Curated annotation (Swiss-Prot):
The lineage of its organism: Bacteria, Pseudomonadati, Pseudomonadota, Betaproteobacteria, Burkholderiales. Belongs to the acyl-CoA dehydrogenase family. It catalyses: 3-sulfinopropanoyl-CoA + H2O = propanoyl-CoA + sulfite + H(+). The keyword Flavoprotein applies. GO terms for molecular function: acyl-CoA dehydrogenase activity; flavin adenine dinucleotide binding; hydrolase activity. Binds 1 FAD per subunit. This is 3-sulfinopropanoyl-CoA desulfinase. The gene is acd.
Amino acid sequence: MFELTDAQRQLQQSARRLALEAIAPHAAQTDRSEQYPWHTVEALREQRLMGMTLPPEYGGKGASYFDTVLVIEELSKVCAASGRIMVESNMGAIGAIMKYGSDAQKQLAARLVLAGDKPAICITEPQAGSAASDMQTRAERRGDTWHLSGCKHWITGGGVSKLHFVFARAIEDGKDTGIAGFIVVGPDVPGMTIQRIPAMGIRGVPEARIEFDDMRVRHDMKVTPPGRTEAGFAGLMNAYNAQRVGAATVALGIAQGAFDLALDYAKRREQFGRPIAEFQGLQWMLADMSIQLEAARLMVWKAAASGSEFPSMFAAAQAKIAAGEAAIKVTNDALQIHGAVGYGRDLPLERMVRDARMFTISGGTAQILRTQVAGTLLGQKLSQRRSA
């Protein structure tokens, strides 16, 4: 279905070399220290991979999402945190701003990303996870200034990101006009407080709780697509489909990295006088892992190539479900093949198991995404709200 061009193969190989030479040697320490991998940022920036999807007129390469996922997978095989940085410097918040923002907003966002910033998209709230439109964060307009108040939760990059794309209810003249996006350049902004949330995996990129207490944002930092504000929210969320494809690719990369380790180990490890790869039970495990990986990769590639501007919601949801669930299964099976040595910290497998777990949760749970897929198949929006 997909045949990579020579240029794409070269890009893939270049990303693989970068991952092995500049990122893999630091991956374990990044996890143990729970420190942001600035060495990765510098390596990506030097190779012009941060912001590679930006249009050339804004300093990027104008790379397609398809080309971008090729890079993301290679990085994620050795370090999920690095793959996550690659995703969010090319997809999600930056995509929404480049599509719907003013020229000044685009220039600002591009400048920050090209300098090495990983934008933070601020949607989730303590009481508004899957039900994102239930968000309570408010932005009240007073003249040419918006005053933001509320709380965002599980914000990836909180504390290290400069560019924050904050979703909030826009209040004008006392009326709720719908959800809009606001560009906030932080993290040291009056009225903005950030608290890190300790997490199970991908510890090199912080998760955070961000509170806004009458934080002021200039009116020219509001991003709303043309048309009604509610339709504008839907437009902004369309950009999030790309982020889901990126997340699916990180999950795929983690799983592929674990599989590669398991396959090599099975060939070398001997028990009962022969390599364990000769045991049928283990052969079937490897076969199933390979099948899950190839199926997930095809869905990720299809999603990355779908849509005219952003990946389609349907394809992105399918890819994220498939890759997220494959990552959990494949990493656990890879650890099982290694036995006790996989359970130890000398190998990256226990880290991969922890890192993989988030991908059926964040950015849309596997359950809520299945509802979206079903709604598309049935041609209707399947509301999860309790009937009156």
